[in-house]
Amino acid sequence: MQRFRSLVLIAAFSAGAVLALVRLFERAATSGRSAQKQRGNQGRNAKRWVFKIAAFLLVAAFGGLLFVTSGIMPIKASSRHWAITAWFLNFAMRRSVVTHSLGTRVPALDDVALVAKGATHYEFGCRPCHGSPDFAQPAIAQQMTPPPPHLPWVVPQWQAKELFYIVKHGVKFTGMPAWPAQQRDDEVWAMVAFLQKLPNLTPEQYQELARGKKVSGAVIDELSGPNNPPQAVGESCARCHGLDGGGRGLSGFPILAGQRPTYLFASLLAYARGERHSGIMQPIAAGLSAQDMREIARYYANLAGLSSPRAVGAGLKPASTISSSFSGNRHDRRDASAIERGREIAMRGMPSQRLPACAACHGPSSTPRNPIYPQLAGQYAEYLALQITLFKKGSRGGTPYAHLMRLVASRLTPEQVHDVTRYYASLGSTTESPAQ
């Protein structure tokens, strides 16, 4: 009843407005008749056309308003787009992506760690709509309008820089979201690296990249013992960080085994609150309860570090065995000169640059340290270098002490970042007790 009254009022208002305009035009025409005779038929006809066009535009505007407010226009996804509408929207989207991606610099995308990092998030965040080599057409997503494309088929139509723009910014009116953390271009490029490999992956290769190697029950028993993995570890954490906490042997995923539980819990909390930016970790952490976070932190903290023979034997296969189709981009940890220079920075700092010693907060040290400071010994050099770079850019949040690292990172040169991260990577992750 209320809608009917609204329609009647709109119709009456529109009719009244049109009649008023017609009368106004008639008066104007009458008052200017003598002048029009002097100007001749050409001027009179031109003025009449102006009046007619103005009246038409006004009527069209009111008609459009009436059409929209009446609710007659269907918005149901089940009706699909008309063919001409679908073509126009697709054409406009493609031209926009091409234009806005101009000038984008594409980094190297062949690192297997980068590809695997994108693959694990694709499995969690993209596969339900876009499918995969082992899951062709998601039934629910196909009822969207427009339906999400099956990416293994359409990715070859796009350049890397265009894929970057789409993944980072999303697409309006399609259900395609923007990347949850706009500060993390490195994560977006990881997704692009994976997408470029996706069309040529077999179902088995996809499973291995996205979910890692399957671990036998005997290995799980040997690895965990009384420290049974919490449910959240199996559901969310293990596909990237492994049940052994070794990051699947890939620098794209940090080593969690032996890390300090206070730091792990604080990091998960920071991700969940959006205080540490990551389009990969934020959605996962946001779905965890505080109890889940504590259990995850306790589980990984109680695992032996990767320098332990038990952990090395039980861990997943290294990156070189994942697939011969991909080439890694690993740095040699045995660069003795870089490690020695890094040791000097870590243990003594650089007074001339007002750089404090890294060991004061991160070890190695025989004195107790703040338990919220992370342990770095044995961590992947590439992962540490990425975190320092993010701190430099102001794109890395974290625990309440994260602001201290922004200042330190801003004073490190690229060469010093290389050296100090190689030094920490060369150390065993059990150099000191996680409690210190």
Where are these regions (language model features)?
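Extracytoplasmic
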Residues: 146-148, 186, 251, 291, ...
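Cys/His-rich metal-chelating microdomains
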Residues: 132-133, 243, 364-365
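Feature marks short, highly hydrophobic, charge-poor N-terminal signal-anchor/signal peptide-like helices
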Residues: 2-10
